[in-house]
Amino acid sequence: MIDSKSGTSGGGREPNQKLLLSECGEGLSAYGLINHRHTSEIEQIASSISGNNIELLFTPHLIPISRGMLSTIYGRLRDPGLTSDDCRILLDNFYRNFNNIKVLPVDTY
């Protein structure tokens, strides 16, 4: 399950009334709940990386910021013996060359 929040810049460059600050300011809304255009892409990449067929639920939300994204991803681990610190090390190693992704320390929110 992926719960993502993004700013209005994710809506593209075309003028859109629902992306105006007067329309989306002080609120948030879910969109693209069924068959979001990025769901199949995320499933394909996750399946390729894991070596398993991954099916997921993706719920994007529009929040009143100009840019940025926060995603919380939930799932079951193949190895139930992994600790939070183990997972953090794995994520740090995987994303070490991605300057736009920041893996936060365990228990940081």
Task: Give the location of each predicted region.
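C-terminal substrate-binding/catalytic lobe of Rossmann-fold NAD(P)-dependent oxidoreductases
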Residues: D3-Y109
